[in-house]
């Protein structure tokens, strides 16, 4: 979401999927340097990491590199997850139809680019759950959930989910 990138994280808004892909690859290169002792030499279009001093080198992790997870909604970020990550975090606004018709094919395209398959990517995602100890709490929770869904529905980046159902406008 552009507002988060520019105003929350104070970063330039350009090519978010390409930047994320490169950030994940750079992170993997750093972990590889730590785990193998290889000289760090990552050079990309957005990031460059070529110095790993002994002071910042934690040494080999006996458990290996951590699993990488990425959330996404649109096809480009979802493809990046399929290409580079171990786990894809589906957005709570994602529907079963959108997951089957848009998300999974995008994950497959990304995985294929990296010589992987969909089975190499764990898919996880949150649900909207409404609970309460009594009717009043339940109604309050329902209203909060409705507001959250309405917010997501009004966010242009999530429009693809609505369009998948024919609810674009």
Question: Where do the model's predicted regions map?
Answer:
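Hydrophobic faces of well-ordered beta-strands that scaffold small-molecule active sites
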Residues: 68-71, 88-90, 121-127
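Acidic/polar active-site rim loop that often engages polyanionic ligands
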Residues: 2-11, 83-85
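Well-ordered beta-strand positions
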Residues: 29, 86-87
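An alpha-helical appendage that flanks or caps ligand/catalytic pockets
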Residues: 9, 13-59, 101-169
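Active-site-proximal loop/turn and secondary-structure-junction residues that shape catalytic pockets
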Residues: 1-3, 94, 127-131
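Short, well-ordered coil/turn segments that N-cap beta-strands
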Residues: 61-67, 84-86, 116-121
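Short, acidic/polar
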Residues: 72-80
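Active-site mouth loops of central-metabolism enzymes
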Residues: 62-73, 129-132
